[in-house]
Amino acid sequence: MTLIFAVSKRTDFDYMAFADQDDIWLPRKLYAAVDKLKDSGETASLYGSNQTLYQDGKEGELRFSCPLDTSLKHHINRNEVSGCTMVMNRKLVTAIVSRPCPPANIIDFRIHDAWVALVAILTGTFIYDPNSYILYRIHENNTVGIRKTSIKERLNRLLLRGNNGEHRANLRSNTASVLLEYYPDIDEEYRAVLEKYAYYRKSMKYRLALLRDKEIIKATGENPLVFRLK
């Protein structure tokens, strides 16, 4: 995330992309992204795409076979669009760096690409391309994604905790609170979603609203009973 803030001081760019050294870009990766973003005008816009799995020097199947959900209710819980596929226009970069860098505990858990996706949804648009223009390497050192998870990671997931031990419910609530603080002028529909997460521990009104929201419960990917008990 600090790289975005550092590079953004330059003014001679129209688009910015993440680049992971592990992955293999196919020839049309940036062309495809810019083609989707070029008509965004003054709208803060993010592009993300599917990936082709790549292991032991062999191309596999697409990572995702179905269209991904790019709604706020989904992304406040989990981000499935990898940063290595993301390209953002200058307007989105400005929307990100015009606010403070998000707290470390949020970035450590959600990772920078999840924050970028959330800001894009709140302030502009998130374009998902079901096609793949990148080979996604699968190996033991992948930070997130397809690799086999450790026993510790599986236990943390079972206990609904991030890898730093903090409860996922707290992290989602903290993320929502920071987004509300940083972006107070968002649409009321988005504000209502974030307020449920940000205030449900302090307000019965928001707690009931969160527990009754079937779309949010589905988006968590968690057992509904476990979600309601948190």
Language-model features: locations:
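Nucleotide-sugar donor-binding/catalytic module of glycosyltransferases
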Residues: 1-150, 162, 229
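C-terminal subregions of glycosyltransferases and related glycan-biosynthesis enzymes
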Residues: 99-105, 109, 137-230
